[in-house]
Amino acid sequence: MLRVIIVDDEQPAREDLRERLNEEHGIEIVAECSNALEAIPAIQRLQPDVVFLDIQMPRINGLELASMLNPESMPHIVFVTAYDEYAIRAFEEHAFDYLLKPLDHQRLAKTLTRLSRDLIVKNNLHKVIKPILRHIPCSGHNRIFLLKIEEVEYLSSELSGVHVVGTVQSGYTQLSLKTLEEKTPFIRCHRQYMVNTEQLGEIQLMDNGAAEVITRSGKHIPVSRRYLKSLKEKLGIA
């Protein structure tokens, strides 16, 4: 699943790109931002795979925004603009691609294919070398502590951080859901939730196509339609 953030100060441009991306399989738009001040914390918090970024924006333009990101951890940047004179500067700022407005469907499709291939390579590499956490560093009630992986029931992304809900105690961690997805055996069941399958009691299916995970202790965790199929596959019940 390619996780995307759209950044453009023009609402019609965001809507056009959103509609085009929604026509493609394997893409999840995790956020839309109208300026750099909204985009920077969203990128840091959500850690998308790719940011489709306009260049001409007020106060902080797209090139300046890209230069503020850490090159070692930044997502792929695809600049989307009506001006071709920024191309050289864009690639100096580590651009993955540079698309001109109005968007050409075939050109966008080629970019998405390249992005998907790159994601597959990265995921395969992570499977080989990814370190697995044994504990999650948490804070709460004026103290810092470690929660064992096997004692965690589920994770939820909130404004104050990722809430780590355990069987005995709970807390908040500065690690992102994306990092925890890479470094723990937990399974994502929703854009904002991950579940420890060792603590899973049952899955209740709903008429609207969504579902709920119920942990052994009776806690209810939402499962979105987008993630239900992959959750069932990973549990061997597809």
Swiss-Prot record:
Can you supply a Gene Ontology BP term from the record?
regulation of DNA-templated transcription
Q: Name one GO molecular function term.
A: transcription cis-regulatory region binding
Chain ranges of the Response regulatory domain: 3-116
Arranged from A to Z, the UniProt key words for this protein are: DNA-binding, Phosphoprotein, Transcription, Transcription regulation, Two-component regulatory system
Residue(s) carrying 4-aspartylphosphate: 54
Return the GO cellular component terms, semicolon-separated: cytosol; protein-DNA complex
Enumerate the PANTHER family for this protein. STAGE 0 SPORULATION PROTEIN A HOMOLOG, TRANSCRIPTIONAL REGULATOR-RELATED
Protein name stated in the entry: Uncharacterized response regulatory protein YPO3287/y0902/YP_0397
- Organism of provenance: Yersinia pestis
Q: List the top taxonomic levels of the source.
A: Bacteria, Pseudomonadati, Pseudomonadota, Gammaproteobacteria, Enterobacterales
